[in-house]
């Protein structure tokens, strides 16, 4: 599973980078990828809002709330 780590990025830059990453990954019809957002509820909310806007399915694992698993 491919992953993107957003640590150290400003929120707006991180969302742009996550959007580009997920859109590229989604060209594969059966994709799943991981976005590492860290321990920031603001970052998580911004990234999940972007994912919702594109209609992607995702979940945040209970064992690691610092990541988002995305699929189509």
Sequence positions of predicted segments:
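N-terminal targeting/trafficking signals and adjacent low-complexity tails
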Residues: 1-72
